[in-house]
Design a protein with these regions (language model features):
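Glycine-rich phosphate-binding loops of nucleotide-dependent enzymes
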Residues: 2-251
Length: 251
């Protein structure tokens, strides 16, 4: 099923497409990592990318963000061709990311990490409101705002990574494996917050190994295998797809 046909459960079919990839190819050296990826994300959606390790999920996010240059194809964001845009310019255009492994600044405090998230912002007057928003989403970060990032628990570091990305005021927030290494209770908390962030108006592109949790949160999903999209549909329909249930849901 094509991306244009798959409709999500919350009726975003008529929302504008904010992110579109068309026949995108990218490489690690001579390794052809993405082999003609085409997908779209509409404003207000949560869209998830599913697949086994090495399928190309993280590579897709890296290519969108300009950390890995697309050799072929086109990437459009908010109506603008960003295929060749340098990675450092993506943040100011509205693309935020909490990367795999969190990558917080371990020797900086929680507050300093958040300040780094807002460093490139031109509207400095809006920063206090965004600190407040992050602390409302993650009260534990406010309790630990003077603590060094490296001393936080895994769950707290994930909260900080997401909070730092939110300080850029992204139109689209890309999350790479937010549940990695977390207890089931913390995973539920993180995903509840992800849905809160989405309800507040941020579009989300999610990579997540916990396929059931991802599909429960998402509107639509894409299944990747060896650098290609092999299936896309509404999240509810993917959950009942026999192949998805057998391969990714352990049924």
């Amino acid at each position: 099923m094509t991306a244009a046909v798959a409709e999500d459960r919350r009726g975003h079919a008529d929302a504008p497409v904010i992110l579109r990839l068309t026949d995108v190819h990218s490489y690690y050296g001579n390794i052809h990592a993405l082999q003609g990826i085409s997908l779209e994300v509409r404003a207000g959606e949560i869209v998830t990318l599913l697949g086994a390790n090495g399928a190309g999920k993280t590579t897709t996010l890296r290519t969108i963000h300009g950390l890995l240059r697309a050799r072929e194809g086109k990437i459009e964001f908010d109506g603008k061709d960003i295929t060749q845009m340098p990675a450092h310019e993506h943040v100011s255009h509205g693309i935020g990311q909490a990367p795999e492994g969190r990558r917080i600044f371990s020797r900086m405090t929680v507050m300093e990490n958040l300040q780094m998230g807002g460093y490139s912002r031109k509207d400095k007057a809006g920063l206090p409101d965004d600190y407040k928003r992050v602390f409302e989403l993650f009260p534990r970060l406010e309790e630990r705002k003077g603590q060094h990032g490296g001393t936080l628990s895994g769950g707290e570091q994930q909260m900080l990574a997401i909070g730092r990305a939110l300080m850029t005021r992204p139109k689209v927030l890309m999350l790479d494996e937010p549940s990695m290494g977390l207890s089931p209770i913390l995973v539920e908390q993180i995903f509840a917050i992800i849905q809160d962030i989405n309800r507040q108006g941020t579009t989300i592109l999610l990579v997540e190994q916990n396929a059931l949790m991802a599909l429960d949160a998402a509107d639509r999903g894409y299944v990747l295998e060896t650098g290609r999209i092999v299936l896309t549909d509404a999240a509810d329909k993917l959950k009942t797809n026999d192949e998805v249930r057998k391969t990714y849901l352990g049924e």
